[in-house]
């Protein structure tokens, strides 16, 4: 069953339409990365799915029902970008309060707080919490009642690298248990191994959607071969030039190493010729990363291949 289906959804306000004509779905047991620059329409799309806004055009179905229906909403967990809590209450008290509001069992509160790494701070007032701790408390609140759909808007904001890795491991566990998860972010480094598909928005339009292999096929960006010479690097360079003659490539030299950017469809015949030459001591192959694909699809330009989006 799909967690949600957007069919040519648009939302217009102040003479702007964001998102516009977006068609997208999320399956149960799937993590979808929703990426785009600030103002691309990520948060508005989430609010449409939550029923906090109404689409101007298109069709929207959430968990087989209508967005905003209380019977649907009780199966959704949501972590907003900026979380705020009553500073005089403890983490345990706040989570118990939200459990009652959602109709979830308060008995799960200690377990959820431990799950997000707040076991030792559950009885401390939240005014003493760091930003990262408040973010983890917000995640625990989103997990109340074992939601079937989990919406996370910039969930790694304020988290250190260890806490971020813990978050991604938890999301994988929830996915394996059947939860559909939307991970909304403009920060790409580190997220690539943890998502099943990526959707890239710019100016409200969906530029691309798919798993990484399909996005790479759509982009048809070059792969990079890093080659270490078994002897004289000049001889290796001559061998590479011979193997790639007539093909569109970019060759770079750094000490005993050569890097070759080449069309992915030309990769195997060139590799076979290079390996047969005996001129290579070592090699590695780098495919376009999620960051590279993001830059390609939004058309930003100016970022070197294998560089990073900030």
Show the residue positions of the predicted features.
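ABC transporter nucleotide-binding domains
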Residues: 3-4, 11-202, 207-208
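Residues at or immediately flanking beta-strands
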Residues: 59, 224, 282-284
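ABC transporter nucleotide-binding domain
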Residues: 168-261
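C-terminal coupling/interaction segments
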Residues: 263-310
